[in-house]
Amino acid sequence: MNLEKINELTAQDMAGVNATILEQLNSDVQLINQLGYYIISGGGKRIRPMIAVLAARAVGYQGNAHVTIAALIEFIHTATLLHDDVVDESDMRRGKATANAAFGNAASVLVGAFIYTRAFQMMTSLGSLKVLEVMSEAVNVIAEGEVLQLMNVNDPDITEENYMRVIYSKTARLFEAAAQCSGILAGCTPEQEKGLQDYGRYLGTAFQLIDDLLDYSADGEHLGKNVGDDLNEGKPTLPLLHAMRHGTPEQSAMIRTAIEQGNGRHLLEPVLEAMTTCGSLEWTRQRAEEEADKAISALQILPDTPWREALIGLAHIAVQRDR
C-alpha cells in the first residue's frame, strides 16, 4: 500500500490526532503556545502516531482512545526533538530554523519539559496502568539512549552493538511503544501484542538506519536540514563506521580524525568518496531493509485487513524514502 492510500485510510483518525495535539498543546503561558505551535506545525512525517492509529485498527479496535495514544506519542517525539536540537546545537530542522535558534535554548528546554508532562497527563486519562508502565519505561529508555549517544560523540572505537543499542533506545523504543500501547488499549491477544511490539522495534531501527544514511546521501534542501551534520558533530553512525573499517588506511585515518575532532564538514567530500568506494551507504540501506523485512514478518500474527496492509506499506516506505 502506498502513502497516498495509507493517508486516505487514516484520514479521519489522523484529523482527530492533529486536533487533539492542538487542543492539548494549549496553555495559559503565551511562550508555550508560540514555541509549541512553531515546532508542531513544522511539517513532520507523523509516522509514529500513524503507527499507533494503524496498530489499534489492525486488531479490531472501534473506539477513539487510540487517538489520544497517537497524539501523546507525537508529543514525546516532539519533546525529544526540542531537547536534541539544544544538545546538538542544531539550527535547522524540516527546512526552517530550529526552535532553539528561533526562541533560545532555555525556552526550548522548558517547553520540551511541558510537552513531556502533558503527554503523561494524557496517559493517565486513558485509565490503563499497563499503557502507563510501557510508556514511562519507554521514555526512560529514550533518555538513556540520548545520554549514550552523547557519550559516543567523538569516539571512533564504538562497536556496532553499541551503535545499535543507541538507535534502539533513542528511536526504535518509541515506535515499539506506539504499536504496543495501541494493541494493549484494543485488548489484543498477548501474541498480537508481541507482534506489534516487534513490528515497532524493527521498523524504528530501519527508520533510524535510513536517517543516518540520508545524512550523507540526501540533498540538504530536500532533507530539511544540513547534510553532514552527523559528521560535523563527531557522531559515529553506521555508514561512517563502515567506511572507516573498510576504507584504505588513509581514508580510515581521515574518518577517525573527523570523528575524534568534530567540525568535519569540510571533509564531507572525501568521506563520501570513501563511502562510495566501500559501498557503505548501500550496506546501510541493506541493513535497514533487513530490519523492515523483520517488521513485516512480525505482522503475520494479525488478521489480513487493510490496516495490516498499511502497516506493511509503512515498512516499505520507511526504507525507500529520501528525506
Model-predicted segments: where are they?
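All-alpha prenyltransferase/terpene-synthase fold signal
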Residues: 1-323
